[in-house]
Amino acid sequence: MSDLFIGELITLSIMAFALGMDAFSVGLGMGMVKLRKKQIFYIGFIIGLFHVIMPLAGMAAGNMLSGLLGVLAVYIGGALLFVLGVQMLMASFKQSEERFMSPAGPGLLLFAIGVSLDSFSVGLSLGIYGSHPLLTITLFGLFSMMLTWLGLLVGKQVQSWLGTYSEALGGIILIVFGLKLLLPI
């Protein structure tokens, strides 16, 4: 394996972790409700699936934009990651109403779309940047699925304060990667 591939693997793993923290934090809240193990498995699987579909769609759009915009596209991608990270960080400190939705049927579908929308934006940025699609969606799907499961399971045991901090950590990580693309460091 080349150093470039290993670097991309590490970078994408950290990004996948950051995006999965959103699903983890919401999973913590959902986990406070009594769920059976089968429901926990199904919820994590659906969240992981949407964290594959959304960045893939974003990467396809990003690849098209990259061809049209050239070098400027990298800066646009960095700006998108930065803004997404700031939004995620700010949202973590807002006192919001109960974010819980029914963990089945349409409620689960809306939940999965909601927590994977940021993956579309990141996928757009990575498509502009020219990232490996298969590696990206595999990591995003696995990380989000496992972190959702972890959030649901830990949610049964832990108070809700951890959810705010995990979402803030995810936002900070995205800000750092956005700055990395924006600033030639």
UniProtKB/Swiss-Prot annotation:
Q: Name one GO molecular function term.
A: manganese ion transmembrane transporter activity
**Residue intervals passing through the bilayer:** 4-24, 40-60, 64-84, 108-128, 134-154, 165-185
Keywords annotated in UniProt: Cell membrane, Ion transport, Manganese, Membrane, Transmembrane, Transmembrane helix, Transport
Q: Give GO cellular component annotations, separated by semicolons.
A: plasma membrane
> One GO BP annotation here?
manganese ion export across plasma membrane
Membrane topology term reads:
Multi-pass membrane protein
Query: Where would you find this protein in the cell?
Result: Cell membrane
The protein's superkingdom reads Bacteria
Per the similarity annotation, which family is this?
A: Belongs to the MntP (TC 9.B.29) family.
Described function? Probably functions as a manganese efflux pump.
Query: Per its UniProt record, what HAMAP family does this chain match?
Result: MntP_pump
Q: What name does this protein carry?
A: Putative manganese efflux pump MntP
What is the organism field in this record? Bacillus subtilis (strain 168)
Query: What does UniProt list as this organism's lineage?
Result: Bacteria, Bacillati, Bacillota, Bacilli, Bacillales
